[in-house]
Amino acid sequence: MKKATVICDMQFGSTGKGLIAGFLAERDQPDVVVTAWSANAGHTYINREGRKWVHCMLANGIVSPKLKAVLIGGGSQMSIPTLISEIMGSLDILQGKSILIHENACIIQQRHVEEEAGPMTKIGSTKKGCGAAMMEKIRRNPESKIVAKDFIDDGLEIPDFKLDGTVGFKDISRHFEELGVCIKVVSNEVYLAVLHKAERVQVEGAQGFSLGLHNGFYPYVTSRECTPAQICSDCNVPISMVDKVVGTMRTYPIRVANRFDDEGKMVGWSGPCYSDQTELTWEQMGVTPEKTTVTKLTRRIFSFSRMQTRQAMLVCMPDEIFLNFANYCASEDELASIIEVISNEGGDVSYIGWGDSAAHIETTLEGDWSDDTNPLFNQYNKSSNIA
C-alpha cells in the first residue's frame, strides 16, 4: 500500500527539512513518523504559534495531530542523552504515544566522540561520534556493545539521567512510563508490524544529497548516502510504500563551517562546491550569518547551482520541491530565475519558504492548506534566518 512521504535534502543540508516536515505533518496528519538520523545535525520546526522544536533524534513530525508512534530506524546513530532531552521537551504532545527504537540502531558512546576529536577529523566534521560509532558497527565485533539491543539492561552512558544503579533501556522505559510516554527497543518484527499497520507514514531524511558518500565530493562527505532510496533503507521503509518524495532546496546553498585551531590555522576544510557555484560572504549577502544548529559555527554560503540541481533531480526524482530562503533573494526576478532553473531540470516548486516558521511557507498547490494571505516578497525579503 502506498502511504509514505519521504523528505530529502537536495543540496548540502540545512535547507529547512525540519520546517517542511512539521508543516506537512500538521497538514497530512501521519500516525507514524520515521527517522534514522545521526546525532550530528539539528532539524528545526517553528509552528504558527511560535513554538520551536530543535531535534537531532526525534522526527519533527511529532506535531502530527494523529500521531501514534515514532520509529527510529536501524540505520540511526543515536545519542541517548539527546533523545531523552528531546522527549522531555515535548512531553505534552507525546502523552500516550510510543517511541520505538529498532534493535539494531547504533548507540553513540563517549569513546566514539573522543575518537573523532583526534587527528582523523580533517574534513569539517561535527565531531559528535557518529562516524566512529558507525565504523564500530560495521566491524561486527561480537564482543562489542554497539546496537540498542546490547543495552537493554545496562551500559548506557547518561551522566544527567537521575537513576540509581546501572542504566539500560529498561530503566529509561520505566522512567518515561510514569511520565505517560512509551519508549522501547523493539525487534525488527515489531518495528515492521507498526510500520505496515500505519495509515499514513512520514519519513524524514537528514543531511543532503551533495554530502552523500557516493554522490558527494569525496572525501568531503558524510558517512552514508542521503538519497530517498538510502533514507528508506535506513528506516526499513519499502520503496513500494512511498507515494511522494518532497525534495528540499534553498536559494543560496550552504556548507558547514571550516575548522580552525586556537591559533586561527585551518585544520578542517568542509569541502568544495560545484563548478558553476561561487562561494559568497554573509556580508555580500546582506543577511545575518547563519550558525549550525549543533556546533554553533558560521556556515559557508554559495550561489545557486544548476549542476547540483540536475544531479539531485536525476537521483532523488522528487514529486514536489520546497524552495526555502526565498527571503535571501535581492529581487523577485532573482527568485523567479532560480525557480525556472529547478523547473527546467524537472522540478516542481510546490512550497516556498520566506522565513523561519510554518507561517512563512507559501504553497503553490491548488486547494492546499495555507495562510489566508500568502507572505509577500517585500514583507519577508532578507528578514529572517532558519537554523
Swiss-Prot record:
Catalytic residues in the record: 14 (proton acceptor)
Gene (UniProt): purZ
SMART domains membership: Adenylsucc_synt (SM00788)
This protein's name: N6-succino-2-amino-2'-deoxyadenylate synthase
Superkingdom field: Viruses
GO molecular function, one term: adenylosuccinate synthase activity
Reactions the enzyme catalyzes: dGMP + L-aspartate + ATP = (2S)-2-amino-2'-deoxyadenylo-succinate + ADP + phosphate + 2 H(+)
Cofactor(s) essential for the protein: Mg(2+)
